[in-house]
């Protein structure tokens, strides 16, 4: 079928695509070096921010004054899930934890949700004003997005919240669909909009895959007429953020009636008590992990009950979660989320008609862990053009390639937007998930695949079956 949407390959800023990225969930290996752990834990022990998780999923009247009377300062509250963030001493936090209406008090750890490390550099050509970007978007062909557009489905009227590290609010591929009034930041000291001077921004790249506009310019997203809202929950500088920011961002997205949340973020925790932070792994009580998981599940459930479909990246650790029972992936390991693994071609430039659905070399997997798969790109081809196996999308000031389950998740979020748009909006997340999985292409495993879950999403089938 011919593509009815075409894009002029232009560059509004001259850029050189010299650095390529592997992004999404941190892949740091858990260590048992007690010396290292103790050193990092000692550094973390000076943290003063705690999450107060109440037994009820609400905040009682007079809560702030009550906390102040005990010697704590309330920094924020998320009453919809009964969670508050306080600044307090260890002694005061212990006193609060003993109150009858408090379920638990846990440190609000700053977690490394996105690996900031660059993938080894390549030296592709600079993008010129006379080139076409569309031909490089192999992921759109893999999921039959052009065929879906030809049916008239483009995500019109659907709101997608991008919970990430902000968005470049000036990018011409994004501004037509970006709701700046609703965009918000939950990162202390940072605006939702990415500041100038950063070559790569994770959230900007993700947003382009979801809903870069059909404007005869640059790239195009899976749902080119969907509205996107930047909900900044990670620092644009480090890719890290506290649990409370993630939870508050999820609730906010639901409150503004987002139809879809995309979270191309995640971290692997050990159920016995290890947390990945920007300073390394720290050892914490296992019960803290359980309570942190409980609080985040509350946020997910709130959004789900409010009609928001939640799409998340499965992770980049190459872990089989069917056999690693001690590992916990958040948020992909929670209920009521669509967890997305990554696929890619191999030497696509040299073999453009080859398989586009090879499981990516890094992707986390497992029948218990993956809902569906989608294009995420890879970098293991020996070809001199290996970077074309990655996903091309928007970055501040231009476009760049990147690979990871972070790139797979927005493909699925875009397809979810197409489904909801066809339904006229306000669609039950359970029904969205059902349509995604029922129309996914079964690549192996008869719809229960180790790497693909129910299959690789198919945009055309999703809006026609």
Regions found by a protein language model. Name each.
Residues 13-48, 126-127, 131-133, 255:
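Bacterial Sec-dependent N-terminal signal peptides
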Residues 51, 85, 159-163, 208, ...:
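Structural recognition of the beta-strand scaffold that forms the well-ordered cores
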Residues 2-13:
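Bacterial N-terminal signal peptides that target proteins for export
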Residues 220, 258-265, 269-273, 306, ...:
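C-terminal subdomain of the subtilisin-like protease fold in secreted/lumenal serine endopeptidases
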Residues 122-227, 233-235, 248-249, 255-256, ...:
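Active-site core segment of subtilase-fold serine proteases
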Residues 329-421:
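Extracellular S/T/G-rich loop segment that most often corresponds to the catalytic His/Ser-adjacent loop
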Residues 64-134, 347, 358:
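Autoinhibitory propeptides
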Residues 149-155, 198-200, 220-223, 240-263, ...:
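Mature extracellular/periplasmic domains of secretome proteins
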């Amino acid at each position: 079928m011919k593509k009815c949407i075409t894009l002029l390959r232009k560059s509004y800023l001259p850029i050189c695509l010299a650095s390529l990225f592997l992004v999404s969930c941190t892949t740091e290996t858990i260590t048992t070096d007690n010396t290292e752990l103790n050193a990092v834990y000692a550094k973390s022990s000076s943290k003063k921010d705690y999450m107060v998780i109440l037994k009820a999923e609400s905040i009682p009247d007079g809560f702030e004054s009550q906390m102040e009377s005990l010697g704590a300062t309330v920094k924020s509250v998320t009453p919809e899930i009964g969670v508050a963030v306080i600044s307090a001493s260890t002694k005061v936090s212990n006193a609060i934890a003993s109150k009858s209406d408090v379920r638990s008090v846990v440190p609000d750890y700053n977690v490394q949700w996105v690996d900031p490390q660059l993938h080894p550099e390549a030296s592709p050509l600079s993008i010129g004003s006379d080139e076409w970007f569309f031909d490089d978007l192999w992921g759109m062909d893999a999921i039959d997005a052009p065929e879906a557009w030809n049916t008239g489905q483009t995500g019109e009227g659907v709101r997608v919240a991008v919970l990430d590290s902000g968005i470049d609010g000036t990018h011409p591929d994004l501004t037509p669909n970006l709701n700046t009034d609703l965009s918000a930041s939950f990162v202390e000291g940072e605006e939702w909009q990415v500041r100038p001077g950063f070559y790569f921004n994770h959230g900007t790249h993700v947003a382009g895959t979801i809903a870069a506009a059909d404007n005869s310019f640059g790239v195009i997203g899976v749902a080119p007429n969907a509205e996107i809202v930047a909900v900044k929950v990670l620092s644009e500088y480090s890719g890290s953020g506290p649990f409370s920011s993630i939870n508050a961002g999820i609730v906010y997205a639901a409150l503004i009636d987002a139809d879809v949340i995309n979270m191309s973020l995640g971290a692997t925790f050990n159920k016995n008590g290890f947390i990945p932070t920007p300073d390394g792994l720290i050892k914490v009580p296992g019960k803290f992990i359980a309570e942190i998981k409980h609080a985040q599940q509350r946020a997910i459930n709130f959004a789900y009950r409010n009609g928001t479909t939640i799409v998340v990246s499965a992770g980049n650790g190459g872990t089989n979660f069917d056999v690693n029972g001690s590992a916990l992936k958040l948020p992909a390991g929670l209920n009521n989320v669509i967890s997305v693994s990554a696929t890619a071609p191999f030497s696509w430039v040299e073999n453009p008609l080859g398989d586009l659905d090879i499981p990516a070399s890094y992707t986390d997997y497992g029948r218990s862990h993956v809902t569906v798969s989608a294009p995420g790109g890879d970098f293991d081809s020996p070809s001199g053009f290996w970077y074309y196996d990655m996903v091309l999308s928007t970055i501040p000031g231009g476009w760049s390639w990147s690979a990871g389950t972070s790139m797979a998740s927005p493909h699925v979020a875009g397809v979810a937007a197409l489904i909801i748009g066809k339904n006229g909006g306000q669609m039950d997340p359970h029904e969205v998930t059902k349509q995604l999985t029922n129309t996914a292409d079964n690549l192996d495993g008869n719809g229960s695949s180790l790497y693909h879950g129910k299959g690789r999403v198919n945009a055309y089938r999703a809006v026609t079956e």
